[in-house]
Amino acid sequence: MAPLRILISNDDGVFADGIRTLAAAAAARGHQVTVVCPDQERSATGHGLTLQTPIRAERADELFAPGVTAWACSGTPADCMKLALFELVKEKPNLVLSGINHGPNLGTDVFCSGTVAAAMEGTLEGIRSLAVSSACFQWRQFQAAADLALEVSEQAIADQWPDNLLLNLNIPPCAREEMGALRWTRLSIRRYDEQFSRREDPRGRAYYWLAGEAVQDLESAGEGPRDWPSDVAQIHANSPSLTPIQPDLFWRGPLSGLPQLKLKDQLVR
């Protein structure tokens, strides 16, 4: 394969081991690598954009492997992608990689994920994009995830990766030889026990810390081959999960499945 122009971002920030391992692995395979990522932790920011304050970007090449061009940006992951594509990167990338996230991005958690949002921004701009996550917050060995992300991306590009298709890759916390087979998976629906820790500042004013724990994972109600496992089940089986995601969130069921609405004696149809 000819060298690719790869743009890499994340939501864990410029000092995260995951993104540095991914960038080094891509450069070692001969690709032209540019990193534009947040200058600090921006996890769970979703697809948020910075509109009320200026966005700053500083070069950060010294934090990465030789040959990698890097920028640290004061904005969100989506800001980083927009700034990269429309200002910092002079030639359009062939591939966007986001990650390696320090923790899973499974099921409906993708709606909160800054990692997935960065990849989705690439998808919306017509670039093949893959988000990759290590499915354990404590696991800090990222080489297997980096290698698998690049293998999947290179093969998907060689096999005519469809437009408007984001690939979401989650890797179990183990060595490559201990993993099961990579499989296509469906998104789970995750239910959380949301908890807030209420505290008071020195002036007696209340503030809150959000803490939640996934207590239930439901099978996806969406379309897709029913023999595919859910992404959560695949990770629980100590196997990597690859979920195809589209930006189109449109309802695909029948009209009869929607609420019947009648406004001013006129049926909504």
Swiss-Prot record:
Q: How is the cofactor bound?
A: Binds 1 divalent metal cation per subunit.
Q: Which cofactor does it need?
A: a divalent metal cation
Documented EC number(s): 3.1.3.5
Among InterPro entries, the record links this protein to: SurE, SurE-like_Pase/nucleotidase, SurE-like_sf
EC top class named in words: hydrolase
Query: What is one cellular component GO term in this UniProt entry?
Result: cytoplasm
Subcellular location(s): the record lists: Cytoplasm
- Which parts of the chain are coiled coil? none
Per UniProt, what is one Pfam family of this protein?
A: SurE
| UniProt keyword annotation of Cytoplasm present | yes
Domain of life the protein comes from: Bacteria
- For a divalent metal cation, which residues are the binding ones? D11, D12, S43, N101
Q: Which reaction does it catalyse?
A: a ribonucleoside 5'-phosphate + H2O = a ribonucleoside + phosphate
Q: Which GO terms describe its molecular function?
A: 3'-nucleotidase activity; 5'-nucleotidase activity; exopolyphosphatase activity; metal ion binding; nucleotide binding
Write the record's keywords in alphabetical order, separated by commas. Cytoplasm, Hydrolase, Metal-binding, Nucleotide-binding
Family designation: Belongs to the SurE nucleotidase family.
Cited function: Nucleotidase that shows phosphatase activity on nucleoside 5'-monophosphates.
Protein's name in the database: 5'-nucleotidase SurE
Protein source organism: Synechococcus sp. (strain CC9605)
